[in-house]
Regions:
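A short, hydrophobic, proline-anchored segment that marks a local hinge/packing element in signaling
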Residues: 100-107, 116
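N-terminal cofactor/phosphate-binding cores enriched in small/glycine residues
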Residues: 18, 22-24, 36-41, 46, ...
Length: 194
């Protein structure tokens, strides 16, 4: 691939990630997304290598490869239409307030990569609101740990997972809106025709 074509493709990939981020800003319930921009959006290979990323929260970017690898290792069957959520620091997550959404990209039944969105949630359960207890002595004080699990399977919500996530936080309505914002970001690629 010549340099001009490579730059055009790179710019298109970054633009996709930026557009995903704008979608998060406009649809999230909490101001930590809309004002503080404490989220990021990326494209990754099936192996977890970063293809492209938007620059919303640079601190989250470095975690993408490990997050993808951890998720792929734990989810036995990844199918079109799946959306996987994950925040467990012991499985590559950044910390419990950082929820990551993954959506596989398939072309003719072949896994080509993942659309990834990461966002900092204001409330994740735990001993204090916000997930940053100074008195914490163990991970369970910090909030609900979510190993990689399908939140949406083949395009349909998994109600039991939604119930579990929303029953363990002080602000279920806000968390619902922010989860949907991150999902809307990973869904955007299906609306874009390259």
């Amino acid at each position: 691939m010549d340099m001009v074509t490579m730059n055009i493709v790179d710019s298109a990939m970054v633009a996709i990630c930026r557009e995903m981020g704008v979608n998060v800003q406009k649809t999230a319930y909490s101001t930590i997304f809309s004002e503080a921009e404490d989220f990021t959006c990326a494209l990754a290979s099936p192996e977890g290598d970063m293809i492209s990323v938007a620059e919303f929260c640079p601190a989250q970017i470095g975690g993408v490869p490990l997050l993808v690898r951890s998720m792929v290792k734990e989810i036995a069957k990844i199918e079109p239409g799946d959306v996987i959520v994950h925040n467990d620091p012991y499985r590559g997550g950044l910390h419990t307030p950082e929820h990551t959404m993954f959506k596989p990209i398939f072309v003719d039944d072949e896994l080509m990569g993942f659309v990834v969105s990461i966002g900092h949630f204001v409330e994740v359960g735990g001993m204090v609101p916000g997930g940053f207890p100074g008195e914490a002595t163990e991970i369970f004080h910090e909030g609900l740990r979510v190993p990689p699990v399908k939140l949406i399977k083949r395009g349909n919500d998994v109600p039991e997972v939604w119930k579990l996530l929303l029953a363990n936080v002080r602000t279920p309505r806000g968390n619902y809106g922010d989860l949907r914002a991150l999902i809307s970001a990973v869904d955007m690629l299906s609306l874009i025709h390259i």
